[in-house]
Amino acid sequence: MADLEGITKHHALFVTVPFQGHFTPAANFAIKLAARGFIVTFVTTEGFHHQRAASGAVSVDGHEVFADARSMGMDIRSELVSDGLPVSFDRTLHRDQFSDAFYHLLRSHVEELMRKLLLAEPPIDVLISDTFNVWPSTLAKKFGLPYVSFWTEAALVFAIYYHVHLLVENGHFGSPTETRKDAIMYIPGVPSIEPTDLVSFFHSPEASWRVLRNVGKAFEEAKGADFVLCNTVQELEAEVIGALQQERPFYAVGPIVPASGEGGAATSLWPELDCSQWLHSRPPRSVLYISFGSIARVSKRDMDEIAYGVLGSKFNFIWVIRPGSGSSEASPLPEGFIEACKGRGMVVPWCRQKQVLLHPAVGGFLTHCGWNSILESMWCGVPMLCFPVRADQPTNRKLVVEDLRIGIDVGSIGEVRERKCRGESTA
């Protein structure tokens, strides 16, 4: 550690994982640490950076990611490491190969960087890592550093993964015969949850072994953490947080959104369109915002039914349809949709989501239930229409609709039906 004007400066190595939903809260939390006097070296992969640069979201050098924070005097440094694959490798098309490289090859490159930064001035003195990395506790112990596990999802989802052995023991997951379908009532801090509300990976037989191997290993590492920091709010998940605190030093540190005077990180995968001028021309609470996040893919049938619901509702709307978010067909929307909605809607490839949600013209959010989107929607006071697609989104839907009661169901992937979608659009 170094001493600057009598103040001890801690140097945190912060390693995220290469997905938008993890990168964004990690980058914004890094800024919060730096605003409180930490030196932060923020690490992501060369492949993820190349993806962002190729889309035009950042320049090749990537210096603007923390440009605002650095202009305010914060000491945030950026480092890139290899995930073991060429930067031009299509990680979206070849998910299994990417997953294998991420879980098996990334560690050696992070370890090499750690050796270098232990000789820096000041040297790193704490490791912060996304919980889904499978090596942080091991490396932290190797170099004598405290390890902080950073969880970007809901505490409820953490509890499910943390207690996956209970699902196996009770026959709700990984059963060699028939998997139980009744309510799960034995996870500490979770009074009851239906199997259909579990993370989507638990419903995919071919993914079962990957869940047990990779996520299981990651959570074994998390059990070796000195602290677990979760991007949630104590008051929203008090019961499950209390139960987790009986197991680990577990703290809610959310919602992690940029505060005034901190500066935000440039975290988008794509250039962001400013919709504010169009929103200014709309009456209060008259606009439905629609976005299915940075990864989810929606079938042509579901896109069509949602589009018909939007068309029949007569509401104003902003619909984010990023490249690759729909089916492989040239146009993800029904023929004639754009013309029929002319004058009351915008279809954009990407936008500044929090800016849109904060605008008084926006009265609702049709969301895939990604955790960052849910937190932003709550932060901005916008009710949600829930359409979970994959991963933790079905579990998040349960929180929003059943526990917190700040949203309603549209359906889930493959379940959108004409009456349901068109009925909700006019509710």
Which residues are covered by each model-predicted region?
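Glycosyltransferase specificity loop/lid
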Residues: 1-427
